[in-house]
């Protein structure tokens, strides 16, 4: 079961995709290769979320930003909540993607940093690293949609790891732009990985998405 502190300001998203309209849950147009077998996989859920990468105080008010969530007493973000739901449904292990340089605690400043990173092709340095990638054959990869695509830290992540022969399953949160070009970008960076159907959930719907996430994981054949 989940313990969440929901947020009241729905005008802000997990950082920003520069879209204020809310979109329903959406499955990306990527399909498994014929004969793909995922049952019994060793599963990792790697995710980047604003709330775990910002300079926030321990007593941060989650209601001050729709990008911040309190999950089981810990500060996270919308994508982090979704990652925990996937872990609960699949029995997979969680891996939080962290940057060396934290993002600002001010929402608008973070939006500006994200835009600067994208416009200048900056790949932020990673502070956390997967030490035992070989033991996993299925990797859920989650992120918010920032500026109509993946945050640039995700390019750092895919630069660092070769997922050849593994199954990669994207998931994301946003205010309305869903995956944008993220799935195509992942396919380009990991041409020898199998990319399965991804799930997008609107930022304001994340805290109520446990059943939707569980059904999706079950549909992939990855329920614990």
What are these regions (language model features)?
Residues 3-6:
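C-terminal motif of bacterial Sec signal peptides marking the signal peptidase cleavage site
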Residues 80-84, 88, 152, 184, ...:
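Solvent-exposed, polar/charged alpha-helical surfaces in well-ordered, non-transmembrane soluble domains
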Residues 50-53, 99-104, 145-149, 174-179, ...:
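Solvent-exposed loop/turn segments at secondary-structure junctions
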Residues 194-224:
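Glycine-rich phosphate/pyrophosphate-binding loop and the adjoining helix
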Residues 67-76, 141-144, 170-175, 200-204:
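Second-shell loop/turn segments in exported
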Residues 107-191:
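Helix-loop-strand module that forms the ligand-binding subsite of alpha/beta enzymes
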Residues 44-46, 94-96, 138-142, 169-172, ...:
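Structural recognition of the beta-strand scaffold that forms the well-ordered cores
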Residues 8, 23-136, 148, 218-224:
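N-terminal beta1-alpha1-beta2 submodule of the flavodoxin-like/Rossmannoid cofactor-binding fold
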